[in-house]
Amino acid sequence: PGLTALPDDHSDELEPSPREECGVFGVWAPGEDVSRLTYFGLYALQHRGQESAGIATSNGSQILVYKDLGLVSQVFDDQALSNLTGHIAVGHVRYATQGATTWENAQPMLGPAAGSTLALAHNGNLTNTRELMDAVHATSGEDLSGELGRGSSTDTAVLAALLNLVSERGALEGWDSAADILTSGITDDADLDAAYSAPAPLSVHHAARRVLPMLRGAFSLVFMDEGTLYAARDPHGVRPLVLGRLGNGWAVASETAAL
C-alpha cells in the first residue's frame, strides 16, 4: 500500500517530483551477527528507498555481497543472511536519483582497490561527476561514460572508480588536490598530511582521504574493505549520517531510527 512501480520508460531525465533519498547502514562489531543487525537497520530505513536492497559483509579476509530489486523483506531470507558472515557489514536501500532501476544499480557496489576489495553504499548526488569522470579518463584512459552506459549509471560507480584509481596511483592527472583541501575547509589535519605523503599504492583509508575533498554536492557514504568500516558525509551535512556505539563496536546509519 502506498507504493507505486516506476514506469517502463524510467530514465535519467528530470522527473516532476524529487527523488533524493536512499538509506545507508554500516556496522563493525566482532562477535555479533552483523548481517542481521544490518537487515533490521535497513528495515528501519525502508521508507528511504524501496527499489532495491543489499548487504555486504566481511570476515576480515573476504567480502560477500547479496543484493536484489525489491523491499528488504523480499530480498533477504534466513538463508541469505546466514551466508553473509563476518564482523563488518554495509547495507543500502535505494531510491533512485540517477540511473534506472536495475540490478546493476543496486548497492552496495563491489569493486577493486589496491591490494584489497571495496564495498560502497552511497546516498546523495555529486555535482561534479563529469569533471571526475574526465579526470579518471585522463589518468587511466578508462572511459567511465561508456562503462556506465553498459551497466551501472550512478555516482556510486564513479566513487568506486575514483577510490580504486587513487589507491593504485595516488592521484588523478591534472587534478589540483591542494585546491580541494582549501575548498573543503580541512586544516591542520595530521591524518590528512599522512595520506598525502604516503606513496602509492595507498590503503583504502589514505585513498579516501585524498578522494573525499574532490567531491562536490550532497552525499553520505558508508564503505569498507576487508578489515575496516568507513563513513563520511559532505562538509555541510546535507545528507544525514549518524554514529552509534555498540557494546563492542560501532554502527552508522542515515537515521537514528536504524540504531
Residue ranges and their predicted role:
Residues 1-259:
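Conserved short alpha-helical segments that host acidic/polar catalytic motifs at enzyme active sites
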